[in-house]
């Protein structure tokens, strides 16, 4: 029994893999075909280690609940703070070791069964730590559907049945399990689906757990992590509290303080960001993720797409005044009317039926967007069709071969050493487990939509269509995410489809989007965690149980936190009625609300057809579909030209897909760091890169996050602030960058041309 292990004598957990590597040729067959994986993931396993222990459940559940509450709570504030699972990963290590040395070995037995577990089955091991981190990661991810609750209660000021809201939150999270189960063999077992972001976690786990002798002139991995963590932690007091402006340095604006055009060119937050950069890790990784975890070819493609869109297409459209671009701010997500003022939705919404009032709409104004926001939607259209075309051309044959091999009886021999170890040592998750979760989630989702007076507005056929979209796109989007660490979102396409089929109903639109696109995101999240478990040799059934329980717990906590805040904070999200010092401005939900206006109330039929302003954006569908074809043709014609194979059209189209939330300064900082580490250092100092790159990424994330939490609770929450000075403003000091430049348009704080 596991509980018989001696607590005082840690076992030697250095059991080598049973795979015998006889020579160089066999080593190539037995190891991963991906160099980064070979440099990071060990080909060893100890299947005797306990995993679902009392420590796993206790520390995992606490981490899940705390992170779900904290991230949901801070998400409503002016400066949202996201605490990543890396923080829990670090904190739970000493706690796990403390429990291993102090808890008794008493066994707990479940009454009426033969099941029992020990409070202390032995030394705290890496596999327990991995599952605790999975708990924490699930809690940190939040629940997207809570934004629907927020816009209903805080923006539209309508009631929503709490049972319907709870079912909405739970089912949107759980539907992804079905798609994960259907595609896990192709996205997990294949060694070519290598999930770059997981290598950061693998490196950190190894640094924290593997004993390493210090060699002369070299730091151990753990010591390196602790040094970088301390430096990152200490430094973040500067951009996080003492000098916030250092996060967005825009020198052009400081020189031309009265020129709107110069500030539009130089502003890193509201303009083109020429010459802007940030000396803050949260600026580098806050919106786009850590560039250290992204392979260089993906960075290069995204950078190329960003340059083409942001510095060629966008300026041409804006300064030629296409779509009356100069009438509106250069960089914003807000909708406008024909006079250049914010769009007033109360003038066109029937408050009784919660549908659009067409006579009122026709007498008021069509809806206008900033040219940046309009083109971002166009790129989203192109990204969808480019993804389909690219995966079909470049990966179609590969996926078909995987599909055929998955049905062979010799499945054990398929894949790399990690796949063979997992199949040899652990039982697979039965397919019916996934099907059962999918079926139960669908039935409850159907009840949430059709019951409760149909408050969600989404009919049964809308739910079926959302599920069909999720099923269709999970695999192609998963292939791209698993190989490039870049996610192709379907939010806009989901909004477009239901907006055409069921216009004028804002809640139906956001519910359809959530069931369609978020279930894909959840599926890929689950599959990504399965791949992490694959690398760390976690029993798949244990991984499934932890993910399922953590998802239900995190969704419940997120729902409870959201409902509590919406019920207890007066005028939450209403900046016109909140006190000036109130932090409850809900910045993320403002964008979500604006999207519900554009796609739900107005609808794409009045936006992207001849009835609206932007029918030209539909050309991006065709452009995106055709763009991969010449790349595929030349890659086949000139196979020796390796650089052609590295051109990735979906990544180019999605290079600016995080805009307008992310700004130019975030992109430039992200690209600069990524190119230095994953191009220059990877090629010139590969040994250092293999040893330290992913640990560096984890340490920078963790140090910044821990100091961010400390600053809030110790200083900001107690209203302890510094005297006002130039660098204490959370801005890039480019006040004119968001001014309209059309003649006669009046905007607060802006000159009238």
Curated annotation (Swiss-Prot):
The keyword Transmembrane applies. GO terms for cellular component: membrane. The keyword Transport applies. Involved in the translocation of tetra- and pentapeptides across the cellular membrane in an energy-dependent manner. Keywords: Membrane, Peptide transport, Protein transport, Transmembrane, Transmembrane helix, Transport. It is a multi-pass membrane protein. Belongs to the oligopeptide OPT transporter (TC 2.A.67.1) family. The chain crosses the membrane at residues 56-76, 80-100, 132-152, 163-183, 224-244, 296-316, 368-388, 432-452, 461-481, 506-528, 544-564, 583-603, 615-635, 662-682, 695-715. One of its GO terms (molecular function) is oligopeptide transmembrane transporter activity. It comes from Arabidopsis thaliana. InterPro entries: Oligpept_transpt (IPR004648), OPT (IPR004813). It is found in: Membrane. This is Oligopeptide transporter 5. Expressed predominantly in flowers, and at a very low level in leaves and roots. GO terms for biological process: protein transport.
């Amino acid at each position: 029994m596991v509980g018989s292990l001696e607590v005082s004598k840690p076992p030697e957990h250095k059991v080598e893999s049973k795979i015998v590597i006889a020579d160089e040729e066999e080593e190539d067959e037995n190891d991963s075909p991906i160099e980064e994986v070979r440099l990071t993931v060990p080909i060893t396993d100890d299947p005797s280690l306990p995993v679902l222990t009392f420590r796993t459940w206790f520390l995992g559940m606490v981490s899940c609940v705390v992170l779900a509450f904290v991230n949901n709570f801070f998400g409503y504030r002016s400066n949202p703070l996201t605490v990543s699972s890396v923080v829990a990963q670090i904190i739970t290590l000493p706690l796990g070791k403390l429990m291993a040395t102090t808890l008794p070995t008493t066994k707990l037995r479940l009454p009426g069964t033969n099941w029992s577990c020990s409070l202390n089955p032995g030394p705290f091991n890496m596999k327990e730590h991995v599952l605790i981190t999975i708990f924490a990661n699930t809690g940190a991810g939040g629940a997207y559907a809570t934004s629907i609750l927020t816009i209903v209660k805080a923006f539209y000021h309508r009631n929503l049945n709490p049972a319907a809201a709870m079912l909405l939150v739970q089912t949107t999270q759980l539907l992804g399990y079905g798609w994960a189960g259907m595609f896990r063999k192709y996205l997990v077992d294949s060694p070519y689906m290598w999930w770059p972001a997981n290598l950061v976690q693998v490196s950190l786990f190894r640094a924290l757990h593997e004993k390493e002798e210090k060699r002369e002139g070299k730091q151990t991995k753990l010591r390196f992590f602790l040094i970088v963590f301390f430096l990152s932690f200490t430094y973040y007091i500067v951009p996080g509290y003492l000098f916030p402006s250092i996060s967005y340095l825009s020198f052009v604006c400081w020189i031309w303080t009265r020129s709107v055009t110069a500030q539009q060119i130089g502003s890193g937050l509201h303009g083109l960001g020429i010459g802007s950069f940030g000396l803050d890790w949260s600026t580098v990784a806050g919106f786009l993720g850590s560039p250290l975890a992204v392979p260089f070819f993906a960075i290069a493609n995204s950078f190329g797409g960003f340059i083409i869109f942001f510095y060629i297409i966008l300026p041409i459209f804006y300064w030629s005044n296409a779509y009356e671009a100069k009438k509106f701010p250069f960089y914003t997500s807000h909708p406008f009317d024909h006079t250049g003022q914010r769009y007033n939705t109360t003038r066109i919404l029937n408050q009784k039926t919660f549908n659009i009032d067409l006579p009122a709409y026709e007498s008021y104004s069509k809806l206008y967007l900033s040219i940046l926001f309009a083109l971002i939607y166009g790129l989203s259209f192109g990204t969808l069709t480019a993804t389909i075309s690219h995966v079909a051309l470049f990966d179609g044959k590969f996926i078909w071969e995987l599909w055929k091999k998955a049905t062979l009886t010799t499945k054990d021999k398929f894949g790399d050493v990690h796949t063979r170890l997992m199949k040899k040592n652990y039982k697979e998750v039965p397919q019916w487990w996934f099907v059962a979760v999918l079926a139960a989630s669908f039935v409850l989702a159907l009840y949430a939509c059709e019951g409760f007076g149909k408050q969600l507005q989404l009919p049964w056929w809308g739910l079926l269509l959302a599920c069909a979209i999720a099923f269709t796109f999970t695999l192609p989007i998963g292939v791209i995410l698993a190989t490039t660490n870049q996610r192709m979102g379907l939010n806009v396409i989901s909004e477009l489809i239901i907006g055409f089929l069921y216009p004028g109903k804002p809640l139906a639109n956001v519910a359809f989007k959530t069931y369609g696109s978020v279930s894909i995101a959840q599926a890929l999240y689950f599959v990504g965690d399965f791949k992490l478990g694959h690398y760390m040799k976690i029993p798949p059934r244990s991984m499934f149980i932890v993910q399922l329980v953590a998802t239900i717990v995190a969704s419940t906590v997120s729902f409870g936190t959201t409902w509590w805040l919406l019920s207890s904070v007066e005028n939450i999200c209403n900046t016109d009625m909140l006190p000036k010092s109130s932090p409850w401005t809900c910045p993320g939900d403002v964008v979500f609300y604006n999207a519900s206006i554009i796609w739900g109330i107005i609808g794409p039929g009045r936006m992207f057809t001849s009835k609206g302003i932007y029918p030209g954006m539909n050309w991006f569908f065709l452009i995106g579909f055709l763009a991969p074809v010449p790349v595929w043709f030349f890659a086949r014609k000139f196979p020796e030209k390796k650089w052609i194979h590295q051109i990735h059209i979906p990544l180019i189209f999605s290079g600016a897909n995080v805009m307008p939330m992310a700004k130019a300064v975030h992109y430039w900082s992200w690209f600069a760091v990524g190119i230095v580490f994953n191009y220059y250092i990877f090629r010139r100092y590969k040994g250092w890169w293999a040893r330290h790159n992913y640990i560096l990424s984890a340490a920078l994330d963790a140090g910044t996050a821990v100091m961010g939490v400390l600053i809030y609770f110790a200083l900001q929450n107690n209203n302890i602030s510094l005297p006002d000075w130039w660098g204490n403003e959370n801005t890039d000091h480019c006040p004119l960058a968001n001014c309209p430049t059309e003649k006669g348009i009046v905007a607060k704080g802006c000159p009238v041309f």
